């Protein structure tokens, strides 16, 4: 979903969000500068800011030196762009930071401080990808081990029956 020019309401605190233009990426990012400090990224915008080498000076300037109000992260949140209920997902396989994602339009909402925390999880995208690969390998490896163990526990008579039955 392309960035709209409409003013959005923060899904965490309901305050009107401010559009901050980030010239380096050529996009507007919606930031709750007068409420909780949350940031809403339209579909695919987040990928422009999630690594350490990507410039977020304009975002930092918009949120620095503010005393943001606390929010209840357990309450359901609705996408400020399309109104769909947002889902909580972990930002990485480390499962340390949860972000709110909209499956309808692809938007992402980060609570105050989460963008910096996500950027500090990995040095670069390659490190993130390697971590995902290790996680998947470990998960599949465990499943394969369980399958092999279950196969070994089958009695010879059961194996014969399975073979005759085409299982």
Language model region names:
Residues 10-13, 32-33, 79-82, 102:
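Short cysteine-rich clusters marking metal-coordination/redox-active sites
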Residues 39-41, 46, 108-110, 115:
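Short, structured motif recognition centered on aromatic/hydrophobic residues
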Residues 45-69, 122-161, 167:
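Short, intrinsically disordered terminal segments enriched in charged and Pro/Gly residues
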Residues 4-6, 25-28, 72-75, 98:
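Short metal-coordination and nucleic-acid-contact micro-motifs, chiefly zinc-binding Cys/His arrays
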Residues 2-12, 16:
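General detector of N-terminal leader/presequence modules that precede the first folded domain
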Residues 17-21, 25-31, 87-91, 97-99:
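Short, recurring structural edge motifs at helix starts
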Residues 16, 35-39, 85, 105-108:
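Cys/His-rich metal-chelating microdomains
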Residues 64-104, 108, 116-118:
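Short, solvent-exposed interaction modules
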